[in-house]
From Swiss-Prot:
Stored InterPro entries: Calycin, Fatty_acid-bd, ILBP, Lipocln_cytosolic_FA-bd_dom
Function: Binds fatty acids in a 1:1 molar ratio.
Broad class of the protein's primary localization: cytoplasm
Source organism: Manduca sexta
Family: Belongs to the calycin superfamily. Fatty-acid binding protein (FABP) family.
Subunit structure: Monomer.
Record PROSITE patterns: FABP
Protein name: Fatty acid-binding protein 2
GO molecular function terms attached to this record: lipid binding
Compartments it resides in: Cytoplasm
The UniProt record lists the keyword Cytoplasm: yes
SUPFAM superfamilies: Lipocalins (SSF50814)
Modified positions (N-acetylserine) in chain numbering: 2
GO cellular component, one term: cytoplasm
Length: 132
């Protein structure tokens, strides 16, 4: 898990605006999120993990255990159920909320991170590419 402790910064994205539209966000919010250049870092502490992300909303740290669902709050304060599963260099985050189920599959490969985003209420696929 050589990716632990590295800070990954967004370098490009594909179809992220389509995913945001499917989630019902306003055009202004979509533009702000698409223009943002977030970072993220994952760390381990025993059998727990934390992901710290920085971006348009400031800094946010989420702590979790692999495979354990928990109550979470995202975006504009929406309460959801989240579950992260860590499997080697792949971290899958499933979010269940009123707007459906979204899956964020994070694949780490050295200094590269590709996040593939799908949703139960959208036929598209979005990708966000990060570099450490």
């Amino acid at each position: 898990m050589s990716y632990l402790g590295k800070v990954y910064s967004l370098v490009k994205q594909e179809n992220f605006d389509g995913f945001l539209k499917s989630a019902g966000l306003s055009d202004d919010k979509i533009q702000a999120l698409v223009s943002d250049k977030p970072t993220q870092k994952m760390e381990a502490n025993g059998d727990s993990y934390s992901i710290t992300s920085t971006g348009i909303g400031g800094e946010r740290t989420v702590s979790f255990k692999s495979g354990v669902e928990f109550d979470d709050v995202i975006g504009a304060g929406e309460s959801v159920k989240s579950m992260y599963t860590v499997d080697g260099n792949v971290v899958t985050h499933v979010v269940k909320g009123d707007a459906g189920v979204a899956t964020f599959k994070k694949e780490y490969n050295g200094d590269d991170l590709v996040v593939t985003i799908t949703s139960s209420n959208w036929d598209g696929v979005a990708r966000r590419y990060y570099k450490a």
